[in-house]
Amino acid sequence: MSNLAPEPEFQQAYNELVHSLRDQNSSRLPQILRLLCLSSPPERVIQFRVTWEDDKGNFQVNRGYRVQFNSALGPYKGGLRFHPTVNLSILKFLGFEQTFKNALTGLNMGGGKGGSDFDPKGKSDNEIRRFCYSFMRELSKHIGQFTDVPAGDIGVGGREIGYLFGAYESYKNQFEGVLTGKGITWGGSLIRPEATGYGLVYYVAHMISYASGGKETFAGKRVAISGSGNVAQYAALKVLELGGKVITLSDSKGALIATGEEGFNETDIELIAKLKLDRGYLTQLHAAEDSFKSRFKYLPGERPWCHVDKVDVALPSATQNEVSEQEAKELIASGCKFLAEGSNMGSTQEAINVYEEDRKSRKADGLWYGPAKAANCGGVAVSGLEMAQNSQRLTWTSEQVDKELAGIMERCFWNCLNPAKEYFDIAEGELPSLVAGANIAGYVKVVNAMKAQGDWW
């Protein structure tokens, strides 16, 4: 019996990796399979008390965390999350996934994740600023441009990054690239807000091209997207740019489903972006805008997956475990051929099993699954490019950053595809498993670096 506390989110991510490495032709993998016990514990876990003052002059206490998972490939890199559900299991899962995701980008970045159970919702700007300064008072002892470079995540946007960066500069008397996601006038990168959504669509574009032998693109594809935050918004805009049709968006209160052939347009996405900036919900937009009432149906409390008649591509972009086993079956029944995750661990393990079984049984006619650690690595890729710009004291153009992002996502696709073809027997007409390829590629790269640095022998 283990004496460790249960960590369900971390265990799910770990089990997925183990399944991929041991499932089929593990004899082709050398002794590194025995290193699962070495690669799963983080190098360091930092936990601390955050005491801050609210607007009434009362002190409040939250927990702060930083999980520095693996630095074999570079400085720890991964976001900070401020949300009441934050705990060590979630942060270990995210740091574990981040390690292999960062490896797939080809950039020199390790993996980490951090945050607090502080809830920024309902807090004033002054309360958030005071919390950020208190949080950074301890975190600043453990991070730096050559050590650990955090970024934003849920609950940590541009405002919070600004306060955290200001606190770090105040405590350390140093202006350095210690955080990414900064404002463009003080060390940030263009295309950073768009990066995860754009990168997701670039990745799926390569899936479509490979599966069709180069004959198909996004043009004319019906695309179901969940979420309506940054990832979903920019994924939708890039799909529209490439000629696809966006037929769903959602938030925590419900889903909008297109009732006709038109789907969402750029103006709709702009309205949704403004709504979300004001922390509103899609139900408000559907109730207030006649154009939304006439073209979309709103389903309170629902996710979109079981409510689309025909769909070609699904992009879960809201939160973890947002596609269940039954929803996976419904998507396949609706004709979905490609599913890639814009959200971290967007599908349950049961749903992933459904995807993979369909890929094997129906071969080229089945659903092809792109896992989060590969498909949504565009955000951290541009964070890596921001680090490069900070080191050079330069700011690249939007076109240059977007070109670099597109190249990284193409390399990431092939970094997943080629190991899947190398390590596993693939039946004639069957598409390679990208989830297995991603897990193997990231894992092998990390453990080989660990061996070169003397972590195992």
UniProtKB/Swiss-Prot annotation:
Q: What class of enzyme is it?
A: oxidoreductase
Could you tell me what reaction this enzyme catalyses?
L-glutamate + NADP(+) + H2O = 2-oxoglutarate + NH4(+) + NADPH + H(+)
**Active-site residues, record numbering mapped to chain:** K113
Q: Which GO terms describe its cellular component?
A: cytosol
User: According to the lineage, what is the superkingdom?
Assistant: Eukaryota
Query: What keyword terms does UniProt attach to this protein?
Result: NADP, Oxidoreductase
EC number, UniProt record? 1.4.1.4
What terms describe the molecular function in GO for this protein?
glutamate dehydrogenase (NADP+) activity
Which pairs of Cys residues are joined through disulfide bonds in the record? none
Listed under GO biological process in this entry are: glutamate biosynthetic process
Q: Name one Pfam family in it.
A: ELFV_dehydrog_N
By its UniProt entry, which PANTHER family does this protein fall under? NADP-SPECIFIC GLUTAMATE DEHYDROGENASE 1-RELATED
Q: How does it assemble?
A: Homohexamer.
Q: Which family does it belong to?
A: Belongs to the Glu/Leu/Phe/Val dehydrogenases family.
Q: What is this protein called?
A: NADP-specific glutamate dehydrogenase
